[in-house]
Swiss-Prot record:
SUPFAM superfamilies for the chain: Photosystem II 10 kDa phosphoprotein PsbH
Quaternary structure annotation from Swiss-Prot or TrEMBL: PSII is composed of 1 copy each of membrane proteins PsbA, PsbB, PsbC, PsbD, PsbE, PsbF, PsbH, PsbI, PsbJ, PsbK, PsbL, PsbM, PsbT, PsbX, PsbY, PsbZ, Psb30/Ycf12, at least 3 peripheral proteins of the oxygen-evolving complex and a large number of cofactors. It forms dimeric complexes.
UniProt-recorded name of the protein: Photosystem II reaction center protein H
Residue(s) carrying Phosphothreonine: T3
InterPro entries listed in its UniProt record: PSII_PsbH (IPR001056), PSII_PsbH_sf (IPR036863)
BP-aspect Gene Ontology terms: photosynthesis; protein stabilization
HAMAP family, per database record: PSII_PsbH (MF_00752)
Bilayer topology term: Single-pass membrane protein
GO cellular component term, pick one: photosystem II
Function: One of the components of the core complex of photosystem II (PSII), required for its stability and/or assembly. PSII is a light-driven water:plastoquinone oxidoreductase that uses light energy to abstract electrons from H(2)O, generating O(2) and a proton gradient subsequently used for ATP formation. It consists of a core antenna complex that captures photons, and an electron transfer chain that converts photonic excitation into a charge separation.
Similarity comment: Belongs to the PsbH family.
Organism this protein belongs to: Nephroselmis olivacea (Green alga)
Length: 81
């Protein structure tokens, strides 16, 4: 029968290989599912997101030449000098 399973397939699924990397990373997974009470590090994440948004806006303004920088060339030709 094509839908039947063999004992060999079940044996392969039940035995798992323990690797040194898995053993080293196991302590990092011990806190899985636990949530710290309160806001935790959310304000810090918000601060870094705001700083990253400001960084992206500055890069966009430089690219669009909206932000004029004296003595800074924004063409490929000036980069080759």
């Amino acid at each position: 029968m094509a839908t039947g399973s063999t004992s060999k397939a079940k044996a392969d699924e039940s035995t798992s290989k323990i690797t040194p990397l898995g053993t080293a990373l196991k302590p990092l997974n011990s806190e899985y599912g636990k949530v710290a009470p309160g806001w935790g590090t959310t304000p810090v994440m918000g601060l870094f997101m705001a700083l990253f948004a400001v960084f992206l806006l500055i890069i966009l303004e430089i690219y669009n030449s909206s932000l004029i920088l004296d003595d800074v060339g924004v063409s490929w030709y000036s980069l080759g000098k």
